[in-house]
């Protein structure tokens, strides 16, 4: 009986270890759990001249993956966001891991994706997009802009865009938390109407850190 429990615990520890991100590695394939889908980008986020890494990785827990009649698989696992910073040793070192802030797919007809990018200035952009294959003509996306400062990552802005595929109506609401300004731009991609822009002041608030709120498409 003791041997059984020892083997069971050892197998559990091995499985748990296989699902962990490595603390250091050379690239995303080296540090992520085997079999996880990923979208990774490289860039200098902390201004030290070294190339860092930001990645969105989706687990492959089979209990949360369904296969449709056409053979396509829907993955309902919650994605994980990881940020690695490059060290003097040339390796990537885990800076932060965020397990619960990204949106997971909840319906077969609604696809939710989070795509990372890094700007030339080193800002991290996380774009959350929603596409409904039925029930809605509107496609929406929200871009969150983050900046590394004071040894952490802070949200400095957000762009919310919506497009009605049937009418061409488009609206983009851009918020800059550094200047406390909001710009709403409305246009029509079909009628090619002149864009209308409306500025608004936002209340001054302390910047939120990455991880302090969920990244949703709103």
Model-found features: residue ranges?
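Beta-propeller blade termini
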Residues: 36-45, 109-122
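Acidic/hydrophobic-patterned starts of short beta strands in beta-sheet-rich repeat architectures
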Residues: 45-57, 119-130
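Bacterial Sec-dependent N-terminal signal peptides
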Residues: 1-21
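Beta-propeller blade repeat segments, especially FG-GAP/WD-type strand-to-loop junctions
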Residues: 20-21, 63-98, 146-148
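Blade-edge motifs of beta-propeller repeat domains
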Residues: 19-33, 88-108, 203
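Short consensus segments that form the blades of beta-propeller domains
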Residues: 30-31, 66-76, 133-139
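Acidic, small-residue rich beta-repeat scaffolds with periodic aromatic anchors
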Residues: 113-218
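N-terminal targeting signals for Sec/Tat export/insertion, comprising classic cleavable signal peptides
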Residues: 28-53
């Amino acid at each position: 009986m003791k041997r059984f429990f020892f083997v069971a615990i050892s197998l559990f520890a091995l499985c748990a270890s296989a699902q962990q991100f490595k603390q250091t590695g050379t690239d995303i394939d080296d540090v992520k759990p085997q079999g996880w889908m990923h979208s990774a980008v490289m860039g200098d986020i902390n201004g030290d001249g070294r190339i860092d890494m930001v990645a969105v990785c989706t687990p492959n827990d089979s209990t949360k993956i369904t296969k449709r009649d056409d053979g396509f698989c829907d993955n309902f696992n919650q994605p994980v966001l990881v940020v690695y910073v490059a060290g003097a040793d040339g390796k990537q070192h885990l800076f932060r891991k965020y397990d619960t802030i990204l949106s997971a797919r909840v319906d077969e007809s609604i696809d939710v994706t989070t795509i990372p990018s890094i700007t030339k200035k080193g800002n991290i952009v996380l774009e959350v997009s929603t596409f409904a294959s039925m029930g809605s003509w509107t496609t929406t996306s929200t871009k969150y802009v983050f900046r590394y400062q004071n040894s952490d990552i802070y949200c400095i802005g957000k762009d919310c865009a919506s497009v009605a595929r049937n009418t061409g109506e488009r609206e983009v609401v851009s918020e800059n938390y550094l200047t406390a300004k909001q710009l709403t731009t409305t246009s029509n991609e079909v009628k090619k109407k002149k864009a209308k822009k409306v500025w608004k002041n936002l209340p001054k608030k302390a910047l939120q850190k990455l991880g302090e709120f969920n990244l949703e498409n709103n």
